[in-house]
């Protein structure tokens, strides 16, 4: 039995399969894959809206030019390190990037982007996400083999869509899958 072929999923979107992941944080989740190597994987759930925050208060922005709250939605990116915040955003903003995917998306995690968003000088599209999802070596591959996830190319329209509740259903439609007809008995051919 030889080594399995490794397919790097960085920059792809994972779509939780219906009827397999039936509860918890990953139920009907969409995860943007930040990094996927043989050493493990990291991603951000981008359809779990939990609240809205005032950027000025949250990041303790001290600037008298911002007099009103700057409310933005906050998303739960996964069960790991909820104290860490990330902006998943369009690549039109390129200051101090944490990651640049060359597919019109980037990730930042610094005070400067929050100030720029508060001043209206930030990226055209952005999501503020706390926490992330991580897999140990081989774990994601096992989950893919057991059909926990479908994989689709990154689609900015899904990521930045206004209604987070419809993102998962729209991803299934994009993949040509009707949830009602999706069998709970799936396997590999």
From Swiss-Prot:
Gene3D superfamilies in UniProt: VC0467-like
GO cellular component terms, A-Z: cytosol
Signal peptide: none
Any Pfam family the entry gives: DUF179
NCBIfam families: PRK00228.1-4
Family membership noted in the UniProt record: Belongs to the UPF0301 (AlgH) family.
HAMAP family: UPF0301
Matches recorded under PANTHER family: UNCHARACTERIZED PROTEIN YQGE, UPF0301 PROTEIN YQGE
Protein name in UniProt: UPF0301 protein RAF_ORF0041
């Amino acid at each position: 039995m030889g080594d399995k072929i490794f397919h790097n999923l960085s920059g792809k979107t994972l779509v939780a399969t219906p009827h397999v992941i039936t509860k918890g944080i990953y139920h009907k989740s969409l995860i943007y894959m930040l990094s996927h190597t043989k050493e493990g994987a990291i991603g951000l759930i981008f359809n779990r809206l939990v609240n809205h925050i005032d950027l000025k208060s949250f990041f303790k922005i001290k600037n008298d030019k911002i007099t009103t709250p700057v409310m933005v939605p906050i998303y739960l990116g996964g069960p790991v390190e909820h104290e860490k915040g990330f902006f998943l955003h369009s690549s039109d903003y390129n200051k101090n990037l944490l990651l640049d995917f060359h597919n019109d998306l980037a990730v930042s995690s610094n005070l400067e982007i929050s100030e720029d968003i508060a001043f209206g000088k930030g990226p055209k599209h952005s999501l503020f996400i706390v926490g992330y999802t991580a897999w140990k070596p081989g774990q994601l591959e096992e989950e893919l083999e057991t059909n926990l996830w479908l994989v689709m190319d990154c689609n900015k329209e899904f990521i930045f869509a206004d209604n987070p509740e419809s993102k998962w259903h729209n991803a299934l439609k994009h993949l040509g899958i009707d949830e009602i007809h999706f069998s709970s008995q799936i396997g590999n051919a």
